[in-house]
Amino acid sequence: MVILENTLQAEIDAVSMHAHRLYNAGDLQSCLEFHERAWSMYPEPRNNWNEAYNTAIYAVDDCFSALDMKNAKTWLDRMAYVNDQLHQRDEELMHHTGKYKYEMGDYDAAFTAFDKVVKMAGKRYFEDEPSKYLNFYIGRT
């Protein structure tokens, strides 16, 4: 992993913070456009940048909050793209995969993903999430 130049990182952070403000204002479409803009600012290959993973997770979290599964899948794939190179957040990625599978109604795959997370990291990834995910997991164990 290479560290981004400070000025570029500050520019990306500003775009990401604006995306978050747009989300808080209820404008998911504009929010996602700014997340996309932040993503496009990373030099290729984007999977070399730890910060690119952060941009993707911010976007996927906004998509989950809005139950926008189509866009969540795009950003989840980007999280995986970066993580496949850096291998830093396997449990976090698996937890988000479980949430996506749950929301898509693929409950067997959701349970499998959540079970892997719990075996790797315990239940800490459920702490700041809607209780439906942990309740689902506990109900299947």
Regions found by a protein language model. Give the residues of each.
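Boundary/linker segments of alpha-helical solenoid repeat arrays
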Residues: 45-49, 84-90, 119-132
